[in-house]
Amino acid sequence: MAHVAKKYKAAAEKVDRAKRYKLDEAMSLVKQTATKKFDETVDASINLGVDPKHADQVVRGAVVLPHGMGKTVRLAVFAKGDKAKEAQEAGADIVGAEDLAEKIQGGFMDFDKLIATPDMMGVVGRLGKILGPRGLMPNPKVGTVTMDLARAVKEQKAGKVEFRVEKAGIVHVPFGKASFDPEKLKANFSAIMEVIYKAKPQTAKGVYVKNVTLSTTMGPGIKLDLAELAAQHA
């Protein structure tokens, strides 16, 4: 543990906690502060000026990252007939209907994402207690309840990430791996911020993006220059 603490301290010392970093510098720094032997995920913590207790201020969405997430996504799809065939041809790993529901009820969870056609939501809905806590319940707002399975499967395979504001008004969203080139991290992050800014609720008052911090899985937080972000997404 002393060795771990020493490595974290060394990484933290590279970051000026009082400074707000420009994007290019932040992306280089986030790579320098990744000290683990595994390829750490890079996350953004975005503090928004919204009150999620009000339904019209719940910010949520999804974005296909230009450079993906650096991992293979195992995808399950609830569909029947021609739609099941469409999902299989698009590259879905598991396709089923009532049979897949029974497997999930029996403990099968060998997938990362779940998509369903609207007509299958009656079956999927009965799995709410299993899927809900794991963040796997399909939702039309993020494109996981759809008739366009070919597109949905390809987007998920390409590295589509979903986000939803939490009770404290914070959005946590991953956007790559520490091994990524800084320019790829920057492109992925910028794609997320573009969607975040466009998702601003009309009823939100005052400053919308109040704080943005980047970090690797086990690394220190790096605060971003908000003026630069606002100018880029004006």
Swiss-Prot record:
<dbReference type="GO" id="GO:0006417">
    <property type="term" value="P:regulation of translation"/>
</dbReference>
<dbReference type="InterPro" id="IPR028364">
    <property type="entry name" value="Ribosomal_uL1/biogenesis"/>
</dbReference>
<comment type="function">
    <text>Binds directly to 23S rRNA. The L1 stalk is quite mobile in the ribosome, and is involved in E site tRNA release.</text>
</comment>
<dbReference type="InterPro" id="IPR023673">
    <property type="entry name" value="Ribosomal_uL1_CS"/>
</dbReference>
<dbReference type="GO" id="GO:0000049">
    <property type="term" value="F:tRNA binding"/>
</dbReference>
<comment type="similarity">
    <text>Belongs to the universal ribosomal protein uL1 family.</text>
</comment>
<dbReference type="GO" id="GO:0006412">
    <property type="term" value="P:translation"/>
</dbReference>
<dbReference type="InterPro" id="IPR002143">
    <property type="entry name" value="Ribosomal_uL1"/>
</dbReference>
<dbReference type="Pfam" id="PF00687">
    <property type="entry name" value="Ribosomal_L1"/>
</dbReference>
<dbReference type="InterPro" id="IPR016095">
    <property type="entry name" value="Ribosomal_uL1_3-a/b-sand"/>
</dbReference>
<dbReference type="InterPro" id="IPR005878">
    <property type="entry name" value="Ribosom_uL1_bac-type"/>
</dbReference>
<keyword id="KW-0687">Ribonucleoprotein</keyword>
<keyword id="KW-0689">Ribosomal protein</keyword>
<keyword id="KW-0820">tRNA-binding</keyword>
<comment type="subunit">
    <text>Part of the 50S ribosomal subunit.</text>
</comment>
<protein>
    <recommendedName>
        <fullName>Large ribosomal subunit protein uL1</fullName>
    </recommendedName>
</protein>
<keyword id="KW-0699">rRNA-binding</keyword>
<dbReference type="GO" id="GO:0003735">
    <property type="term" value="F:structural constituent of ribosome"/>
</dbReference>
<comment type="function">
    <text>Protein L1 is also a translational repressor protein, it controls the translation of the L11 operon by binding to its mRNA.</text>
</comment>
<keyword id="KW-0810">Translation regulation</keyword>
<keyword id="KW-0694">RNA-binding</keyword>
<dbReference type="GO" id="GO:0019843">
    <property type="term" value="F:rRNA binding"/>
</dbReference>
<dbReference type="GO" id="GO:0022625">
    <property type="term" value="C:cytosolic large ribosomal subunit"/>
</dbReference>
<keyword id="KW-0678">Repressor</keyword>
<dbReference type="InterPro" id="IPR023674">
    <property type="entry name" value="Ribosomal_uL1-like"/>
</dbReference>
